[in-house]
Amino acid sequence: MLRRWVRAGDSVEWFAAGFPGAAPAAVLDGIRIVRAGRQWSVHAQAVRRYRGRLAGRFDRVIDEVNTMPFFTPLWADIPASLLIFQLAREVWWYESRFPISAIGYALEPWYLRLYRDTNAYTISASTRDDLRSLGWRAPITVIPIGIEEVAVEPVGRSAVPTFLYVGRLAPSKRVHDIVKAFYDFQASGPPGRLSLIGDGPLAYVRRLRRLVSSLGIEHAVEFCGRLPVAEKHRRMAQAMALLMTSVREGWGLVVTEAGACGTPALVYDVPGLRDSVRHQESGLIVSPSPSHLASAMRRLVADPPLQQRLAAGARAWSQTFSLDHSAQVLRAAMIASTE
């Protein structure tokens, strides 16, 4: 979206954490990139670099929250807006060890309340409602999140019912639930295949491999790792459905991406995923449990008309989203907030 703002004539500076080998400053597609600090020090570096130095250089600062915000209401000398895709909430318990998990879970509502009078931008009604539950008083704009255009050569569905997961192999994504649901499906349905695309923490990947082995389904489960975009889209187009079981998402952009390939999604009824799927139109939303997911898989395989209807609905729903539109909506909201 920032590239589109630059093309519209805006000047954009993006401050981010550094990484090994990264230049401290660069220009990418017209965007000035400034890097300092690392994961746990980037917030302090932002204060050191920009405190008292924003006015006259910028019209607005966007405080983008990825679990931890930059606390701009406490130090920015120009109006700030909050960009937040999702609250962490339950993710703390899956991705952090005690006591960090408990501390993070307890503190998150309190530090987000510092922004209650700050204009916020998010990508789903679920996150908007989460913010409102914290007593948010300022406007919250939901930005329809788009994707780059997906170009997929026409391919047929795999002869064997194939299900797909795309994303991080991480505890909060509950990929272990997908494996258990697939085992349930295999035990009482036609033979199928499960492809897991993505990587993640080695300990969790090993846990998944042990689970697959203990269930005796190694022959039907493929750990694909990260794939080139074209290959990922080809596999999406061949799959009967995308499976998503996260504890929560901001939206679940891969759902829209799969939909652009004509592939519906079977998802848990959790924040974000219940927004990105239209139940019975672009996919199916089920109660969060492997058994409910397996039932949805069996239902889809046994009902070709449902397959066709959901595939068409997923493609049509995905076509209502574009990055051009996302950039326009967010830019218009930003301009309106400074007038």
Where are these regions (language model features)?
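Glycosyltransferase donor-sugar binding loop
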Residues: G18, R193-R207, G225
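Membrane-proximal helix-turn-helix segments that form the acceptor-binding/catalytic region
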Residues: I100-A120
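Carbohydrate-associated surface elements
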Residues: S126, G146
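Nucleotide-activated donor-binding/catalytic signature segment of Leloir-type glycosyltransferases, i.e.
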Residues: R206-L227
